[in-house]
Amino acid sequence: MKYRTHKCNELSLDHVGEHVRLSGWVHRYRNHGGVVFIDLRDCFGITQIVCRQEENPELHQLMDQVRSEWVLCVEGLVCARLEGMENPNLVTGSIEVEVSSLEVLSRAQNLPFSISDEHINVNEELRLTYRYLDMRRGDILDRLMCRHKVMLACRQYLDEQGFTEVVTPILGKSTPEGARDYLVPSRIYPGNFYALPQSPQLFKQILMVGGLDRYFQIATCFRDEDLRADRQPEFTQIDMEMSFGGPEDLFPVVEELVARLFAVKGIELKAPFLRMTYQEAKDSYGTDKPDLRFGLRLKNCCEYARKFTFSIFLDQLAYGGTVKGFCVPGGADMSRKQLDIYTDFVKRYGAMGLVWIKKQDGGVSSNVAKFASEDVFQEMFEAFEAKDQDILLLIAAPEAVANQALDHLRRLIARERQLYDSTQYNFVWITDFPLFAKEEGELCPEHHPFTAPLDEDISLLDSDPFAVRSSSYDLVLNGYEIASGSQRIHNPDLQNKIFALLKLSQESVKEKFGFFIDALSFGTPPHLGIALGLDRIMMVLTGAETIREVIAFPKTQKAGDLMMSAPSEILPIQLKELGLKL
């Protein structure tokens, strides 16, 4: 049986007089007495079909029994709609199909939520439980089809650039990469476990050792970590690695790749992208993921804070803290109530409070007005280039606290005051990250232990490791990190040195990374790589609020699959086969 001659988005006035066959779901049903109208929907669009009782009473009776989301196959004649009855919201809105025969292919139960009315707000848990119904509402399928086109564009471009797609193993060895591993018990080796990959990091580096010049993979990765709006326990990344190159070779390739991906949605990007060091980003925006669609740039105010008699300023400076903030153009219209709300907001991030200074009619209004002279305030206005009716918002706190609080505050204010265009795409490369971070007073990798230090900082590894910068880079878009990578260590002695600084014993290194150190010891080319978060890119590209909206079958924020009721208990016999007990 041939189910269709056309899709539900294809018919137009050019087809009037043709006999056609369509298949799809009942999107909407309307019985106007002697006339039944059905909007028939498939993946591609909607076509109105119609049956008149006076012309075909038996068929009219059958169509009158049809309900929402039944699957139909219909035959009929394409006719022009009556003048004034056209639907400009449909590509098929100038025609309708007068049905001559109808077959019910599948019936549907009563729906848990409306599919035809996309504007009805449906609880997300209910949507995820019935994900297959949620897909029919339109947005999800549109995003999945866009994702498909993005992956096609990715593969085509990287092939043009000489990259080879290689699939790396899913079952691997548990190695410390930052997050917790998902572990898979081995039946054949009782008491031993595979780990699902947090990334193909070691495999792709070993591919470079093996002589592959350029590698890529659209890889599924797994991390057992606490979830946020832009995180999932399993996610997809565009993984890349290349030999005999540095950042200056990689950046143009990635910029053109991103441009090709955005071109799928008709968005034109300009390259090269802006570059900024990690320290510049922290100093000016309080974060290594700055949103550059708007200003509100941070400025250090310590030299002016010392001229105050305000104890909170002076105490923070005495204990090595900072005073910094930003200027909000036209922000002098903020009420006391609004400023109190902002004060409570920054306290969530550890700040003690918020200092505000308004420039109004050439004078000063401030909650710290009595702690400094008029001249000091005027100096601050000049430093911030503040104009009349602007406001300065300042925080006195340890550097990390001040940065975090101000980062969140500037984003909040920019959103509330509509200081940016939501259709604007501002990319920036963040470079020269610290090689190490501090965790409970100990060294830990800022990215991962395979990142190469900058050549000029290698001499500091023993004397001042926290001052060592790395040859690493993130690509940030509108405040989201969408890619991260680095130059890799290709010298086994330097790699062992990094492991030693991280206080990994030789036994531990041999157990977890012995195979990798062995590989580096057989002649390894200089190499570097990057991974682009496909889910995050799709989230930004399609305007989705979370990455759950761009994944076919996502997990909840508690890492559960509501549709399949996973994770689930397993049978005692399965545990026994694995040599496990609960």
Swiss-Prot record:
InterPro entries: Aa-tRNA-synt_II (IPR004364), aa-tRNA-synth_II (IPR006195), aa-tRNA-synth_II/BPL/LPL (IPR045864), Asp-tRNA-ligase_1 (IPR004524), Asp-tRNA-ligase_1_N (IPR047089), Asp/Asn-tRNA-synth_IIb (IPR002312), AspRS_core (IPR047090), GAD-like_sf (IPR004115). Its main location: cytoplasm. Residues 201-204 are annotated as: Aspartate. It holds the Pfam family tRNA-synt_2. Its EC number is 6.1.1.23. One of its GO terms (molecular function) is aspartate-tRNA(Asn) ligase activity. GO terms for cellular component: cytoplasm. It catalyses: tRNA(Asx) + L-aspartate + ATP = L-aspartyl-tRNA(Asx) + AMP + diphosphate. It comes from the Bacteria. It is an enzyme of class 6 (ligase). CDD domains: AspRS_core, EcAspRS_like_N. Keywords: Aminoacyl-tRNA synthetase, ATP-binding, Cytoplasm, Ligase, Nucleotide-binding, Protein biosynthesis. Coiled coil: none annotated. L-aspartate binds at E177, R223, H447, R488. The record marks H32, G84 as: Important for tRNA non-discrimination. Signal peptide: none annotated. It is found in: Cytoplasm. ATP binds at R223, D224, E225, Q232, E481, G533, L534, D535, R536. One of its GO terms (biological process) is aspartyl-tRNA aminoacylation. Aspartyl-tRNA synthetase with relaxed tRNA specificity since it is able to aspartylate not only its cognate tRNA(Asp) but also tRNA(Asn). Reaction proceeds in two steps: L-aspartate is first activated by ATP to form Asp-AMP and then transferred to the acceptor end of tRNA(Asp/Asn). Homodimer. Belongs to the class-II aminoacyl-tRNA synthetase family. Type 1 subfamily. This is Aspartate--tRNA(Asp/Asn) ligase. It comes from Chlamydia trachomatis serovar D (strain ATCC VR-885 / DSM 19411 / UW-3/Cx). The lineage of its organism: Bacteria, Pseudomonadati, Chlamydiota, Chlamydiia, Chlamydiales.
